[in-house]
Amino acid sequence: MHVSKKEIEVRYAETDQMGIVYHANYLVWMEVGRTALIKDLGFLYSDMEKKGVLSPVVDINISYKKPLHYGETAVVHTWIEDYNGFKTVYGYHIYNPAGELSIKATSSHICVDKESFKPIQFRKAFPDWHTAYEKAKK
């Protein structure tokens, strides 16, 4: 299983009135982690889009454990939790500077045609990605 690791410095604008990271910003960081994982595997999401394919989120689950604060550095760990050639489930752990788990999450994605939004078979449309995902998954 390949785990991508990406550091993110918490910016002031990402915090709320309580002085902690606003909950929705973790979703943005998950996307940053997912993009880093794809790059680690030798691909670019933008190349998929150039071929007229999008990969929307179809399900998301997030559990908040410990808050992060302005000025701290978060570390996003991302991996392929499950993959069946059609749907990909990415797993995420985001850690605080003490190495404590801040969030635990998954997001599920499928591929669709950009124009029709009809689902497509990832393994058929991107056989090289398929091979890499099979090797990298949990």
UniProtKB/Swiss-Prot annotation:
Sorted keywords for this record are: Hydrolase
Q: What is its EC number?
A: 3.1.2.-
Report which superkingdom the organism of origin falls in. Bacteria
**What molecular function does GO assign, one term?**
fatty acyl-CoA hydrolase activity
Query: What does the record give as the active site?
Result: 16
Gene3D superfamilies, alphabetized: Hotdog Thioesterase
CDD domains with a match to the protein in the record: 4HBT
Q: State the family named in the UniProt similarity comment for this chain.
A: Belongs to the 4-hydroxybenzoyl-CoA thioesterase family.
Q: What does this protein do?
A: Has acyl-CoA thioesterase activity.
The molecule here is called: Putative acyl-CoA thioesterase YneP
